[in-house]
Amino acid sequence: MCLFLLLFPYLASGQFLQTVKVGLLFSKDTASVMRAVGYRTSAAAVLVARDRIRAEHLLDQYDFNFTVKFDECTEGLAGGKTVELINHDNVDVIIGPTCNRAGIAVASLAAYYNVPVFQWGLTTAADIGNVSRYPTTVTLSLDTHSMALGVREVLRRFEWDEFVFIYSNDGDEEKCASMKDDLEKMGIENSDVTLAYMVQIQTVTLDALQKALTEVSKRGRIIIACFANGRGFKKAFVASTVLAGMSTDEYMYMFAEPQSRGFYVDEINGGEHYSWDDTDGNFVTGLTPEQIRDAYGKVLYICDNMGLPTTITPEFANFSSQLISRMTEQPFNCVQDCSNSTYKVPATYAGQLFDAFYAYGVALNRSLTQDPTRANLKNGSFVLSDIGMSFQGVGGGTVTLDDTGTRIVQVYMFALNTSLLPYLAASLVINGSEVEYTPFYKSEADLWSVRPLARPICGFSGLECPPDFVKEYLVYTIIAAVIVVLALLAGCAGLLYTMQMKRKEMERQDLLWQVPFIELQQVQSKSKAEASMHSFASGPSTSTKITVESRSETINFIFYYYQQDILAAMKHDLILQFDAEQKAEFRQMRNFDNDNLNKFIGLCLDGPQLFSLWRFCSRGSLSDVISKSSMQMDSFFMFSLIRDISNGLLFIHNSFLKCHGHLTSRCCLIDDRWQIKISGYGLKSVRTFENPKKEDLLWTPPENLRNENEERLPEGDIYSFGIICSEILTRSSAFDLENRKEKPDVIIYQVKKGGHNPMRPSLDTGETVEINPALLHLIRDCWTERPSERPSIEQVRGHLNGMRDGRKSNLMDHVFNMLETYASTLEEEVSDRTKELVEEKKKSDVLLYRMLPKMVADKLKLGQTVEPETFEQVTIFFSDVVQFTTLAGKCTPLQVVTLLNDLYTIFDGIIEQNDVYKVETIGDGYLCVSGLPHRNGNEHIRHIARMSLGFLSSLEFFRVQHLPSERINLRIGINCGSVVAGVVGLTMPRYCLFGDAVNTASRMESNGKPGKIHVTAEANQMLTQVVGGFRTESRGEVIIKGKGVMETYWLLGEQSRISVSAQAPREKTPEPPRRQSVRSISPIIEKMSEETQKGLYSAYKDFNNGNECVS
């Protein structure tokens, strides 16, 4: 029956399988290692691993034959059993042994025989992992060399540059000795960590432990300890720290060893408990578990995954159940010997045995794939030539071997949390000499309250610190303390003073931007009378400046004088209370100083409404200049305006304001030097409550049109900047509103709508100005739909600087050069125009001199006032056409004008022959004077007399064109006397005569006879006695209205000339008047007065002084 079972695999497959002989070395009855690697609780792991190998079809053509030997962890026995397995049993591979000394012996023999060996369990000596000495040995255990590297990384991580080591070989002669060797080697090979002191305890007792702790307290504060497992040594050590008074925050203890359960202790029945609850051992400390647990709070454990709390996964549970049950199978046949309940729990490192055998199966599969000959099964060098692998193990998570067969191990650092419960603090992956540290704690506060120092500040003896300065220099200390207190008081006083002064300074600065309304004086616009007072020499102005006096208030602004400066006060229809943050904003705004920012003066809070005050710019806004200025803009002029706006925006974007938020061309003001100054910035708290006009939204970016509550950003200013640039280049308003059919509402809706081709202004600049295409591209980038795609103001400035073409002149210089060029080109045209002007001026002067006396006209042209002038002796001449009303009734109006023009042309020719000034003609009335404005002595009477005689003689030959049969006759009156002459009126100014002599001359004409020259007694005396040469005849006494009875005369002619009227007209000799009373003669005088007043000449009486003013 047994033979059949042995032959069944071969019969089932139809062919005989090759056999791999496997030698197994175990420790069967050694009590110290039974729980970890005991034969009865671990050997069956090779059968479970064989099943996995078959399931993965790694060695389908091979079967395994197992030979079991027991070395009991002794090197002599292990060496002998190894020789038997190799020479007698002819095995292909040896799995084991499980202890250090036995493992070194087997590894040496395997290297000699070139047999592959896979060790596991407690083989932790670093020498076993030396590939150069033992090239055919693979160890799956965590060695002490790797553990030493992990300790060094932890020490470096917490800046501990020195440590001490306490260990004992009591109960385990191999583990701690190997750990000591590797720590010593690590301290020698690395300068960053030093092993300062080392103590070995021969027999572990409480006294020995306390003595050792007292000794090391003089050499170190970071203490690494190593003791045998399962005998209560570690708990006794921790308890000894309490008894020795060394469980304080000044110390840190570390257990760094392989095959450690950390803060857990295994129980025989498979369970576990905390180390401070361990009852194993004969140590009576007198301490409670709570005291010992508190001391464990100063302990760190560095060990493999055995330190983790036991977790039973389904895979491990299946492995554990098979491990115990299959010990009864071949080749172990452990039935009675394994029936004790002690052997019902798998050994601690049984999983490593599974991993070791499975790793061999993978390595053999690879070697047989390369060379399937039978001879290579036992060739250790060939089997391990491709040993590098990684797989999921049963005993320790992922198993990774490098190309030399050295396992890349992962160890863990465990600590107690604030609740004094174990937790995983960090992970350390050790690959050769490299260590990767991964912390799982949030901060070091999870590990300790204060990190311990490797060396106390005052040294281990406490004598390295300098002596207490206070005790040594008590007097000086007291003096220094007093000085410090006084200094602190002075500092506090200074701080309070500084704060007080700062508060006062803030209040002072607040007074600067809070302008009282009483200190503002409104600019008064000029009255109409003042506006009309222009001299004859003044001409129209061509300046582009805005005279603030021309208008004192607009819809949005009122202009005020403040401290001899003109301010523009922006109106805000609201009343607000400002908090400290807003006041700080106003203070900072008032301190702004930039060439392209309009100065913010402050706010007026106590006026009829809220005013924000800004400096007045004489040329108005950019919008005004574009819409009203006739000044020609070339490309450099436009570029300079755009550059000024970008400079102002750069300052705003880099200030605390971050953005303007409401930038329009109306905010861009222009000063005397044609420099743009941005106004209206800041005042966010004020603008929040204002409703902008539709026209002001034409510059608003689409994102703010869609959401009015969205915060204004610098990208929005860039959009507004692009709209303003389009206004400058096209020399039109935003979106060319005046020449569009759409209203602002429609345009704003289209901009808000957006889309693939959003609404934007035209950039058609015409052919008169050459614009850089790069500038047009920049403007289009500025108003792109997505804010994130718009350039920043720094980028805009960079692009503009690249377009300067090397020109560095400013705009004012450019304007001067442009005006100079313009002046030179117009020089010839001005010269021609000047010649024409001189000719026209001559014509104007001739006309003016005919209307006014030359002397008077010259004064008026110079803008001088013509003062009234008194002339003591002049001769006044009045004439009137007899029965002109009857004659005019026979003519049309045009014929009347023709008649008078023909007549006056003859008269004007006669006047030019004499020193006579023609004052005025009214209808058919004629007024002349001689002796003014140029005085001519007594010759004035001669010139008037000759002119009068000439008038009468010229009528003999004068004929009316349309009435040839009609004859014209004149009545002439002459008087001599004093008059006052002057210019009266602004519109159509006239040179007028004032005086009684004027009225008397008028009465002479009105009381005269047709064809006669009627003169007064004064004129007669001048004619006959003063100048002589004229013949006159007395008319007698005549009643003159306003004069009473006057004696008058007829001028008959000049003695040297033929008399115009040789004889006086015959009149009936009046009867002597009868005596009548004054009362009875009055009606007669009134009737005579009415008859003598007939005529078309009108005289105007001045009721204030009784003089006649003829105009």
From Swiss-Prot:
Keyword Transport set for record: no
Domain Protein kinase: 482-817
Expression sites (tissue/organ): Expressed asymmetrically in ASEL sensory neuron.
GO terms assigned for molecular function: ATP binding; GTP binding; guanylate cyclase activity; identical protein binding; peptide receptor activity; protein kinase activity
GO biological process: cGMP biosynthetic process; chemosensory behavior; chemotaxis; intracellular signal transduction; receptor guanylyl cyclase signaling pathway; response to alkaline pH; response to lithium ion; response to salt
Enzyme class: lyase
Keywords: ATP-binding, Cell membrane, Cell projection, cGMP biosynthesis, Chemotaxis, Glycoprotein, GTP-binding, Lyase, Membrane, Nucleotide-binding, Receptor, Signal, Transmembrane, Transmembrane helix
Entry-linked SUPFAM superfamilies: Nucleotide cyclase (SSF55073), Periplasmic binding protein-like I (SSF53822), Protein kinase-like (PK-like) (SSF56112)
Site annotation Involved in sensing alkaline pH: residues: H145
Record keyword NAD present: no
Stretches assigned to the Extracellular side: 15-473
PROSITE patterns in alphabetical order: GUANYLATE_CYCLASE_1, GUANYLATE_CYCLASE_2, PROTEIN_KINASE_DOM
Effect of H57Q: No effect on chemotaxis to alkaline pH. No effect on chemotaxis toward Na+. Normal cilium localization
InterPro entries: A/G_cyclase, A/G_cyclase_CS, ANF_lig-bd_rcpt, Cyclic_nucleotide_synthase, Kinase-like_dom_sf, Nucleotide_cyclase, Peripla_BP_I, Prot_kinase_dom
Spans annotated as Disordered: 1061-1082
Disulfide bonds: none
Primary localization class, coarse: membrane
Catalytic function, reaction form: GTP = 3',5'-cyclic GMP + diphosphate
Highest taxon, organism lineage: Eukaryota
Family: Belongs to the adenylyl cyclase class-4/guanylyl cyclase family.
Designated name of the protein: Receptor-type guanylate cyclase gcy-14
Classification of source organism: Eukaryota, Metazoa, Ecdysozoa, Nematoda, Chromadorea
